[in-house]
Every structure is written in structure tokens, then in C-alpha cells.
Amino acid sequence: MDFLKTVASEYSKSQQGSGSNDAQHQQSGLSGMLLNNNLFDVLDSDADKKKTAEAAAQASGSHGNSDMFHNVLNKLNQNKHSVAQEKDNVDEDFAVKMFKKFVEKKDTSSDEKASSNNLGAAAAMQAIKMFNSGSGSGSSSSGSGGQAALLGLAMSEGSKLFDNAQAEGKVAKGTTKESVIEQAVQFALKFFLKSQTSGSSGGNSGLMGLAAKFL
């Protein structure tokens, strides 16, 4: 929730004549803004990437910094079309399993290591859960706040999961914090794009349906 408020506030400040669009109003409308904008537009915008990186750094506290997050977003922008082509192959059940193992700590039977792919999937699912629980049926006005929230949440949660796994001595060999964050935003992008093409009600219902598996 703190992250959603931060993004909403930063987005509100960036708009002219935004006096009536306070942080609470923007927060409630994040889902609507997400649906009314091309997610690629955020990645194409240096200003949006910078705001997203800064908000993610604030949300992650000592776990991450804006330079690292900005680098990850730049890489995602360069690879966004190839990542998008993989959207239909993304495994929701696998991501939910990783979420339960590394976030909820419920799945103790599996022996999956804390690799970039596993932690990234878990972080993306946590981001979707937080995004849906923090959004409502408010404003449907256009803007980049929604996209920034989804990508930023994935990055901040990825950085936290890596540090937690490292503290427990469970990080797989060769796994770095940046590689986890890269996987987290890639999973988030794939899930969003897949949700846009599944069902007749659009991306929001798709993300809500995905979150319903563990909410």
C-alpha cells in the first residue's frame, strides 16, 4: 500500500491541474489507468522509468536503489518485444508455487533453490497480489501510474526476496539481485500481456483471476 501511495503521489504531482487528483483518488484508480494505457509506453518513456525506479527504491528501503532499478527497466525496454512473445508460455501454476514457497513459506516439501527464475516468479505474483489488493473501482483516467505500480512493485519485491533468501543462505549459485529483479519484471509484463488476451473482460479481470488463486 505504501508503494501504491508513493506512485500515485508522484504521478499526481507530474500532472498539470492535478489539484483534484489527490493521492487517495489516484490510488483507487490504478487499475483503470493500467487498462487504459499501453504498458510499453511506460518503458519507452525515460521520465516514467525514472519515476518508477525512484518509487521502487523508496518502497524497497535498504534492499534496492534507483540506479539498479532504472538499469533493469532499460533492459526490459530493449527486450520487451521478445519477452512479449513468450507471454502465452508463462506458467501461472509455477509462479503460484514459487509464491507459496518463497513469500508465504508454506511449501516446505519442494526443494527448488532460490534462483533468479524462481524468486522472480514469486516476486511478480506478490506484486500482482499487492496491486489488486491496493486498487479499486475508482478513476479510469489515463496516465502512467498503474503501469509504474505494477512494474515497480515487482522490482521492490524482487529485491526483498533476494535479500531474505541470501540471509537464509538459500540463494542458488550464480544468482544476483539484479537478475532476480530482471526476472520479476519480465514475469509481471508477461502476466499482464497474457491477461489482456485471455477472457472477454480485459486485463484487469485476468489479473484478478490470477490473484484469486492465492488471495
Regions found by a protein language model. Give the residues of each.
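Amphipathic alpha-helical interaction segments
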Residues: M1-L215
